[in-house]
Amino acid sequence: MTENITKLKKQLLNNHILDISIGLVYLWFGGLKYFPELSPAEDLAKNTITSLTFGMIPDNISIILLAIWETLIGVLLLLNIYRRQVIIIALIHMVFTFTPLFLFSEQSFNNSYFYLTLLGQYIIKNIIIIGGLLTLYKLSVTKRRLL
């Protein structure tokens, strides 16, 4: 009995490490956005949301909504609650994180589309998060089929 419990704990922990790491990133980045001028991505986020919503959402509201969105994703991933739904919401968010590459390409690239600015690198690194989220989604679908 104890051996089975140990195996189960190990399996749960191994599958949850990716949830925890992505959840912490979301919680951290989202948490910074609650405090004006603390997040290095604040201006980019405001400008992107303004462009995507055609200015219909004021900057001070949009950044708080984004902070809520990101911290909620982070908390739910950390707690492993509504896992599949949260992963889908996070993937949608990740798609939108790439829009500045097109909306503000002059800020994302230097001289060439292969030479990224620091801002461009900040955006491109989200590919890693997308890979992790897709892995988690695949695991959740596989787990659901087994049940």
Segments predicted by a language model, with ranges:
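Membrane-interface extramembranous regions
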Residues: 1-72, 76-147
